[in-house]
């Protein structure tokens, strides 16, 4: 009996090894993938970023140096949940993509360059870099070298905070690079539970896109999930560092899957959570993680050999705060506060396609309608498409021409004007089109601003 069991075990083991070997042969030219997840430790007392109101601000700026890392805003008082940096490295032939997600309200180009420079110094092979912020409003501040953003919502720049975040990003990429191996991939979409509401009273995008990556043998390597939601379930009164609902949901998924889970926000400009508070946050995180887990189970990974990247540089109008869009039509339209001294006049969009799954970065908070327009135009070329919002830069809000006219917070924060949202949406569509050329859509409006493209 024992002999039969041994023989059966050897046969089953041999069959398993043969199956893995066969899969490995099928994956001889597969995309390789590596992922990592690491806890971030910022200096104690670092301020929080996201809310600009008085509940987060010091009564007086810290001109006397009472706080080591805070100036305009109150210091944090510890962590509610661990801050996490996650990384995914993809490679196919000479094409490489390094993707970093952080529990931050946003990232600016200076921060991204700091990560790029440190990656180069550390000897990590050169890759197209995407740095995505989750948009939590309870993440650390003081990491942007911008006087304007510091005053408004992030606090004065502190190199110690920025360096800690950059170091975590580089360490995560290095670890992901070390674990890189042939991978199977698949993407799917699931409907989100009713956990968001529109700031503009309009239809929202209920889609959660789930990108599943496994080893050749089926072991989970990484999960990327894309959904639009503001990280404002914790209020401005909260002074504990937190990844908010998206961070909690991702942590739950990591515990179940045993692999890094990267959250990437979507077209979030007009999207708020339906409920607020710590208990509601935990309930919403559970609902979202359950939906994403269903997407993971639904996706059927297969060998994938193509990774394409397209980059598109877009010039922008002069940025300014329009007092008419902030306070109403009674204010003459020519009254505006110019911001050209503090905000860029150009931006770069990165589009990538892993087989029939494509995404494009967006440097801020895009309105749902424009995000859905991007998806609609690209769905003829790709099975799954998503917008990676709050990635590689932060330039405020981008809305439709119609919704820029009303005096709302969203319109007030649309500092590049009523045409910039459509302009960047068109540029994003063009970047996706370059990944898989096809017939030009007859319904797509032409770009409203000059742009240049470089593709490979």
Language-model-derived ranges and their functions:
Residues 1-2:
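N-terminal secretory signal peptides that target proteins for export/translocation
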Residues 5-16:
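Bacterial N-terminal signal peptides
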Residues 17-24:
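Sec/Tat signal peptide C-region and signal peptidase I cleavage site
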Residues 24-132, 136-268, 273-283, 296, ...:
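Conserved beta-alpha junction segments in alpha/beta enzyme cores
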Residues 288:
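Anionic-ligand-binding alpha/beta catalytic cores of soluble enzymes and soluble regulatory domains
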